From Swiss-Prot:
One of its GO terms (molecular function) is zinc ion binding. Its cofactor is Zn(2+). Keywords: ATP-binding, Ligase, Metal-binding, Nucleotide-binding, Queuosine biosynthesis, Zinc. Zn(2+) binds at C188, C197, C200, C203. It comes from Clostridium botulinum (strain Okra / Type B1). It catalyses: 7-carboxy-7-deazaguanine + NH4(+) + ATP = 7-cyano-7-deazaguanine + ADP + phosphate + H2O + H(+). PANTHER family: 7-CYANO-7-DEAZAGUANINE SYNTHASE (PTHR42914:SF1). This is 7-cyano-7-deazaguanine synthase.
Length: 219
């Protein structure tokens, strides 16, 4: 297994950017892969491109526009408004069926062609917002499936799996990239960079985590 190279599933948001710089500390070569799935917050791809260009990281954007045809949701459809809070039953309408399944599968195909075994993704079960494809059991299951499907030894690493947003901010701080994550990323479902719209679930989670992180710094 090649332990010197890694591929990061990179959206240009807080979590994946933190993982990207975490990976840069641990691996000699890091490649970022992003996806265009006709997301309304497509500005995140510009953030991803800018970050990779600025910090000299090889970057690829793969076309997954068909995802919008298969799974209508509030992140890709202009006629569906993002839920401001999680529903009592079921998943939020911002959940894109099959997104992480497809992202990781396509990245695995890409990784094998590059002779890379390690795939890094910023999913978290602690702050998973009701998304079933952010759970540890899903990642472990998919890891086994990909290994069997391609007769190849992949290792999917999830640095944020068991930490919350405040701890993710602390990780960025410890890595020396707090300002990069705070100012140059896009987490907002409404496509507003940095602090975002302040109203969508992603912005609320990000802000709540940052306020908790600030309390930690003051202690």
């Amino acid at each position: 297994m090649n332990k010197e190279k890694a591929i990061v599933v990179f959206s240009g948001g807080q979590d994946s950017t933190t993982c990207l710089f975490w990976a840069k500390k641990k691996y000699k070569e890091v490649i970022a892969v992003s996806f265009d799935y006709n997301q309304k917050h497509k500005l995140e791809l510009d953030c991803a491109k800018d970050i990779c260009k600025k910090y000299n990281i090889e970057h690829h954007i793969l076309d997954l526009n068909l995802l919008n045809q298969l799974a209508p949701n509030s992140l890709t459809r202009q006629d569906i408004t993002v839920d401001k809070s999680a529903p009592k039953e079921g998943v939020p309408n911002s959940f894109v069926d099959g997104r992480n399944l497809l992202f990781l599968s396509f990245v695995a195909v890409f990784a094998k062609q590059k002779g890379i075994n390690t795939i890094i993704t910023g999913v978290s079960q602690s702050d998973f917002s009701g998304y079933p494809d952010c759970r540890d059991v899903f990642i472990k299951s998919l890891n086994v499936t990909l290994n069997l499907a391609m007769d190849y030894e992949f290792e999917i690493i999830t640095p944020l799996m068991w930490i919350n947003k405040a701890e993710t901010w602390k990780m960025a701080y410890d890595l020396g990239v707090l300002d990069i994550v705070k100012e140059e990323t896009l987490t907002c479902y409404n496509g507003i960079k940095a602090d975002g719209c302040g109203e969508c679930p992603a912005c609320n989670l990000r802000k709540k985590g940052y306020l908790e992180f600030e309390k930690y710094l003051m202690n």
